[in-house]
Regions:
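Conserved pre-motif I regulatory segment
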Residues: 1-32
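Walker A/P-loop
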Residues: 23-46, 252
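Conserved Walker A/P-loop ATP-binding site and its immediately adjacent core
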Residues: 41-73, 256
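Conserved helicase ATPase core of P-loop NTP-dependent helicases/translocases
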Residues: 65, 80-90, 250, 259-261, ...
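Conserved RecA-like P-loop NTPase helicase motor core
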Residues: 99-105, 124, 274-367
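Post-DEXD/H (motif II) to motif III coupling segment of the RecA-like Helicase ATP-binding lobe
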Residues: 123-195
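Conserved interdomain linker/interface between the two RecA-like ATPase lobes of SF2 helicase motors
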Residues: 175-250
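A conserved SF2-helicase RecA2
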Residues: 179-193, 337-401
Length: 467
């Protein structure tokens, strides 16, 4: 019989409170759960709790299967609407992939769907995107997103890329974080396998940022892969893993071509890429899960939604500037399994140096700064990556108890839904949300920027209780 873990119970309680919240600005909420924390069960528990029709969206076939199976395990009844499964059936509980339902929002609305649940909500949940358009067709009362990585890497032509929290960028549909289970709590409660890090030397001189500045160019990634003799080093590390008793190894590489080159060097290995036919992919993964195949090399797939608790070895040769990709790849091996005492993670792309160990990561609503991702006391979000790092001590503001004074010549809002309104008529919850959108451009065509900054300073004082 399924017994929920304490963090799953707390997440469910926070979701329940969110569903009862009638604040119109609190429609889109994010639940943060580490890799291996059992998001599928939290989704299933939420669906069970609801008394109205619900739509569950996940980006891949693998995640859909995983989430659907967990709900059925708990005794639920549901249907699947997905071309990947060759079944398209709507019901009061529907599990789906976005591409299959993007044009049937009206049909889903007619079912009476009031709640939408989105797994891996950091992925393609931007305003104006497929999922956003679908939500607008359905018009639910609440949208609940779940993810291990509530961040988005956002480019800027003038300042370079910034890593932003999902609720602090105007490009994301989500505006609040309603629950966080920290990685350190999962570890302290014994729900992660002990990670053995192997941080191999990496020369990054060949890497070049792409035009948006949010990642490295594909060509420079391949060149760096080759300059570091990565194929040979993967084989060497794989052999070391096997000699240590590692039973199952998943390898991430930067291209389809490199996957097949490596396949020729590791006896008995198999390859899965985003070009592999679904039927062949299923057969390969079944052999891997059954222990027939010891090593699977992959590109463009298996980063999320691949549930293999016995996996005890990952070699990551995929160079990335994305924390989400790094964490998802590393997270494939943290799940608990019988007779699995430790998990070996080998990094050949400089990713550990770039992001640190995942155990040190926390997502925190810090004092009057708001939500941020931290590694210890170091802030990792909310400012251009080219700038010097910021720490918690830099974020602590001295609050003046004197009533704030609007020293700006600007007295009314000049944009958005409250355009033309005097400040006194604008809800503080909206002002607070607006100030937390790190990507929002504060500009007024009729006033100099110094006046805009004075206005913004006054807004900050208002939400801090000085107005």
């Amino acid at each position: 019989m399924f017994k929920p873990r304490e963090h799953q119970v707390q997440a469910n309680l926070d979701i329940r409170a969110f569903l009862k919240d009638t604040n119109p600005f609190n429609k889109y909420g994010v639940v943060v759960q580490p890799c291996g924390a059992g998001k599928s069960f939290i989704i299933a528990m939420t669906v069970q709790m609801l008394k109205t029709p619900v739509l569950v969206i996940q980006p891949t076939k693998e995640l859909l299967s995983q989430n659907y199976d967990k709900y059925i395990t708990l005794g639920g009844e549901a249907t699947i609407y997905s071309a990947s499964f060759n079944t398209k059936e709507l019901s009061s509980v529907t599990y789906s992939t976005p591409g299959s339902i993007k044009n049937i929002g009206k049909d889903i609305k007619d079912l009476g769907v009031k709640v939408i649940i989105i797994d891996e909500c950091h992925y393609k949940c931007t305003k104006g995107g497929v999922i956003d358009k679908l939500i607008k067709q359905i018009n639910p009362s609440k949208v609940i997103g779940l993810t291990a990585t509530p961040v988005i890497l956002e480019p800027s032509l003038d300042l370079g890329s910034s890593l932003l929290m999902l609720n602090r960028t105007s490009k994301s549909i989500f505006n609040s974080i309603i629950h966080v289970t920290q990685i350190k709590d999962i570890i302290s409660n014994g729900y992660w396998t002990n990670i053995i890090y192997h941080n191999e030397k990496f020369d990054s001189k060949s890497l070049v940022k792409n035009s948006s500045g949010n990642d490295f160019t594909d060509s420079s990634i391949i060149k760096s892969f080759e300059d570091n003799n990565t194929l040979e080093r993967i084989v060497d590390n794989y052999n070391k893993m096997i000699s240590k008793g590692v039973k199952h190894v998943l390898i991430f590489v930067p291209s389809v071509e490199k996957a097949y080159e490596l396949n020729d060097l590791i006896k008995g290995s198999e390859v899965v890429t985003d070009e592999t036919k679904p039927k062949d992919r299923s057969s390969i993964l079944k052999r891997f899960l059954d222990g027939v195949t010891r090593c699977v090399i992959n590109f463009g797939i298996l980063g999320t939604g691949f549930d293999f608790p016995s996996l005890d070895g990952v070699i990551n040769a995929r160079i990335t500037n994305s924390f989400a990709i790094y964490y998802q790849f590393l997270g494939r091996g943290v799940r608990l399994a019988e007779n699995k005492k430790e998990y070996h993670y080998v990094d050949l792309g400089g990713n550990i140096d770039r992001f640190g160990k995942v155990e040190d990561i926390i997502f925190e609503d810090f004092l009057d700064y708001g939500w941020g991702m931290f590694s210890g006391s170091k802030l990792l979000t909310g400012y251009p990556l080219i700038q010097d790092p910021k720490f918690k001590k830099d974020l602590i503001k001295v609050v003046d108890n004197k009533p704030a004074v609007n020293k700006s010549k600007i007295k009314n809002f000049w944009f958005g839904k409250h355009s033309g309104k005097h400040l006194a008529r604008v809800p503080k919850v909206y002002i607070d949300w607006l100030l937390k959108q790190d990507s929002f451009k504060w500009y007024h065509k009729d006033y100099k920027q110094v006046e805009v900054e004075k206005f913004k300073t006054y807004l900050k004082a208002l939400v801090n209780g000085q107005g």
